[in-house]
Each structure stands twice: as C-alpha cells, then as structure tokens.
Amino acid sequence: MDKLQYELQGYLEIDRYRKQRFLYPLLFREYIYALAHDHGLNSSIFYEPTENLGYDNDNKSSSLIVKRLITRLHQQNHLTISVNDSRFVGPNRSFYSQTIPEGFAGIMEIPFSVRLVCSLERERIAKYQNLRSIHSIFPFLEDKLSHLYYVSDILIPYPIHLEILLQTLRTRIRDAPSLHLLRCFLHEHHNWNSLITSNKSISIFSKENQRLFLFLYNSHVYECESVLVFLRKQSSYLRSISSLAFLERTHFYGKIKHLVVTPRNDSQRTLPLWFFKEPLMHYVRYQGKSIMASRCTNLLMXKWKYYLVNFWQCHFHLWSQPGRIHINELSNHSFYFLGYLSGVRLTPWVIRSQMLENSFMIDTAIKRFDTIVPIFPLIGSLVKAKFCNVSGYPISKSVWADSSDSDIIGRFGWICRNLSHYHSGSSKKHSLCRIKYILRLSCARTLARKHKSTVRAICKRLGPKLLEEFLTEEHEIVSFILRRTRLRNERIWYLDIIRINGLVPHS
C-alpha cells in the first residue's frame, strides 16, 4: 500500500519540474493582451470557446489603452496595493477589472496549453482543436452503456475557499507575484465563494472576468481527475486468469472471475498478493457533473465512491458527501442525464429460426439504451416562464402582447425548434409533442389577448402560418437524408445541445 501511495505521489509530480517561474513579467508585454483578446495560444483546445458561454467579443481592445495600462503597471506596484484601494475602484474600476484579468488569464494558460499541445503531438492526434468532451458522450451512451450494469452520478466538488484553489494551482505554477496578483483578483470578487459552491453552470460567472474563472475551474477539474488516469494505468497491470484456488467458498464462482495474483518480485513469488480485479470503469464529465459506469458489482462501485470522496477530502480538502453520490442499477433504475431520463431496458424480440423444413419461434430480450423526455420538469420550466399553469394548461404570455404578430410567433417558434433540436435524442417523442402543443396554444392565446379575440378566430385567420413556425427545419433536412428510416423513433444527437435549451433543468 505504501508503494502504491508513493507511485501516486510520483504520478502527481510528473512534469512539475517544468513549472513556469517567470510569468509575471509577461504582464508588461503588449502582445500578451492582443493574444488574450484574440483567444490565441489555441485556447479553445483547453476549454470550450468562451463566445459560446456568453463572453463578449464585440469590445475591441485598444492598443492605446493597453500601453497606458503597461505604463501604470511600471509606475505602480499593484501587488502591494490593497484591493480596497481607491485606485482599484472608481472610474477606472472596469479598466483594471477587465483588461488585466484578461491578459493574466492568457498568461496563466501558457504552461497548460503548451503541455497539452506537446502531449497531443506526442500521441500523434491530428486536428486536436476539434476535440470536445461532448463528442465522446453520445457514442458512449449508444455503444457502451447498454452493456454496463451500474452507473454512479457524481457532482464534482468545488473548493470551499479560494485559498484552496490557489494552493492547488501553486503545485503547477511557481510564480509568487502572479499567484499574489491572482489572489487580489479573486478577493475583488466578493461573491466568488458563493459562485464556486453553487450548482449552476460555469456560465453564471460575470462576463467581464469570465475567461479567468473558466481557466481556474478547468485547472481545478484537471487536478481532481488526475487520479483517475493513474488508477486506470495501475489497473492495466492486472491480468485475468482462468482458475485459482480460493479459500473462501462463499460465492466461489462469482468471485473467481475477479481475482488475480500479482507477485511482488522474483524473491517473493511464494507470497502472492490477492487483489480483486477492477473491471474497466467508464468516466464521462458534463456541466460540472460526471458519471462513472462499469460492469462491476455494487460492492466495487461503493468502493470507488468512498475512495474518490476520501481522496478529494484528504488531498484537495474538498468536501463531498457520499450520500449525494447515487449508485443505480441500470436494469432497474433510470438516471437524470443532460435533460433526459436515461436507462437500459430489456426489449422483447421474437426471432424466427428456419432449419430445413422445421421453423422455430424464439423469444429473447435485448438490452437497449432508452432515453425519455421527462414531462414534469419541462412543465415546471414552462410554469416558471409563465407559458402554462401548474396543471399544464396553456396561458397567454402577457409581457409579449405588445409585440408584433410575427415577433410573437417567431419567439414561440424559436423555443419549439430549440426543444425539438435538444430532445432529438429521445427514444419516445410523446412528451415532447405535449410540450409543443402547450407552446402552440400559449402562442394562440397571446395573440388572442393582443387582438382581444378568441383562440378559434386567431387560428382561423392565421391558418397554416401559425403551424409552420413550430415545425423544425432540421427535421426536414434529416428526413431528406434518412428517407427509409422511421424518424419518429430514431435518435439523432446534435453536438451543440449543451447550450441550446434554457428550459432544461440541469440540476
């Protein structure tokens, strides 16, 4: 066990001799701010593009402002100034709170981006700019999940205090002035501790310093997930065997499949170590959460859960409650994933087998990955947006009644198209049809409220125009490509659904 801990510590220390010690002087280089503003250094391979998360790219960086900033940095030692100093507030507050963190974030990305590019080039991975975690989610759901037994839904823990985040970052970057400046930026945002402990998406961060917060969040997640790579490499050394002598006879044949003998060295071959062979564990991260799925038993899944919780608490001082990590058996329970109720169902099939003159009817069951649109959370979102009441009865959107008819119809149609686009991966579309019906009738009631008329009169006057706005454009394109398939029951996944539907509750 001590040897394993030593190897883990050595793994976590890999590449730390390459720590960047002189990042702070780059703040005095004008080209750094140009690169940061243009999102250079291939920053899109480190995390999702910030423009997709609401980052404002319309404000052009002025070279004159940057030169004035560098001059002030030379004249004043901001690292010794309190955050509450008057020079940090007042008319120049936005100047300091946006320009400096933007350039600072670009500087902090340098060691991570260089390390990532080198590792990808070493593995000979081409077109790595297009790599996204979203690209691996849907093939995993379709190809792997139906063959697994248990799944664990995990909320990635957040640091309870920003100093813990800085200590974690200090293991990768040894530059005291830069880290002290980062501490000033974080203390300037008094609501940082409330942001890192909330369950909302990273996109809730203020737009002015969003790139810096995205970098900090991704570096934090990178450290939390580093142990998973180490454990995967360790488990690859275990070798499966056909038979073994085992003293305990309880559930003998069930346990014999998960046993392996690993000799320590040549002199200790007579004293083998007995391990349970850990089956392959699948890990997928999305929107601040992650799932772990495997073919292993419930006992081994529970061991994984408590190991991760204890590791996060002891190594990173991250508080995670074991009771909030649920282990579900896929054949009996569904889990909430990306706005879907997902699970594995046994689908009965009747197979006709012909052998010479005799035919046989064979009843069998095939595991099938199933995704269902949850109706009640979506209706709850519609109630919150005031499209219907708690019973699902459509009501008029009074705040839109002053807009033009085309604007009202366009807004409702846009919501319906996004819903159809997002939930195109559903196995059954009945719940989605009900939601679209509520929105269509709510649109008609809004128009009737505006014209002081009835819903029947509005539908008769607009005719097909009201219905056409609620048809999805991509459905027509896909139906042209896949003419021979039944699109009603076909799952079609789109890679941009994470940021499409604001009505989907992700908590």
Curated annotation (Swiss-Prot):
GO terms for cellular component: chloroplast. GO terms for molecular function: RNA binding. The gene is matK. Belongs to the intron maturase 2 family. MatK subfamily. One of its GO terms (biological process) is tRNA processing. This is Maturase K. Usually encoded in the trnK tRNA gene intron. Probably assists in splicing its own and other chloroplast group II introns. HAMAP family: MatK. Pfam families: Intron_maturas2, MatK_N. Keywords: Chloroplast, mRNA processing, Plastid, RNA-binding, tRNA processing. It is found in: Plastid, Chloroplast.
